[in-house]
Amino acid sequence: MNIWTDRKKECAGRNNTVWENVQMKKRISEILNEFRYFWQTKCFAAGIILTTLISYGIILTNPTIGVDDTAFAEYYADGISPAMGRWCVYLLNKIFPMAYNPFVCGAIDLIVFGISITLWCVVFRRMFGEKISVWGYTLFGCVMLSSPIISELVVWYVHNGITMGYGLIALAVLFTLEALREGVTNKIAIPILPALFLLTVALGFYESFMIVYLMAVLMVFLLIRLLDKKEYSKKA
């Protein structure tokens, strides 16, 4: 009798694992489809590319050397960066070793930034849907891309992983939204664990991303309340 019970539990566990894998693939597929939606829209693609060229074209082709750039080897070869708690860029440099090259690093940085901004547009589209046209999302993307607070970092220091961190936080917020959909059940662990992992990696780039994540989650809670979306509302 115990053998049959154990087999049933084992089969149930396998079924749960398969179901979790299917759900995770479905969530990732939805994010990719929404990501493609923006870049298949001409006004969004043209707006982001044009804003990138206008905002960073001169900086990219005429790089400056800051004090942190002169200490590139100390940060990413000798281990000062992980000692500061910023271990992700150090790890990336070990996996993909690259000498100091402002143009190449800056170009990669801007491509990653474009991806990160698109993921934030996906976050807002999950909240607003068609209530905001693609022109509204394009305007948001262009403003974020050309923000002086962020662009200043590109001028002085292109190796800090800030742009990648923004994308990881956006993904963490998306998975947090999925956790809200599940409610307080055993299934909540499926999306919340990836969210925690992504948040941890983002903090490895820059510890201030904790504030970005918390503010984003608070913003999501406020928008859910204001928009009264049925899929996120809890039953009394």
Regions found by a protein language model. Give the residues of each.
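Membrane-interface alpha helices of multi-pass inner-membrane proteins
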Residues: 190-207, 212
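Transmembrane signal-anchor helices characteristic of membrane glycosylation enzymes that use polyprenol
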Residues: 36-66
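Short, Lys/Arg-rich, polar N-terminal cytosolic tail immediately upstream
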Residues: 3-4, 17-37
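Extracytoplasmic catalytic/substrate-binding loops of multi-pass membrane glycan-assembly enzymes
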Residues: 54-72, 80-92
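Membrane-interface transmembrane helices that cradle and orient dolichyl/undecaprenyl
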Residues: 169-191, 224-231
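Membrane-interface micro-motifs in multi-pass membrane enzymes
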Residues: 82-86, 112, 132-180, 204-209, ...
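Short hydrophobic/aromatic helix or loop-helix immediately within or flanking a transmembrane segment
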Residues: 79-107, 111
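Perimembrane helix-loop-helix junctions
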Residues: 212-236
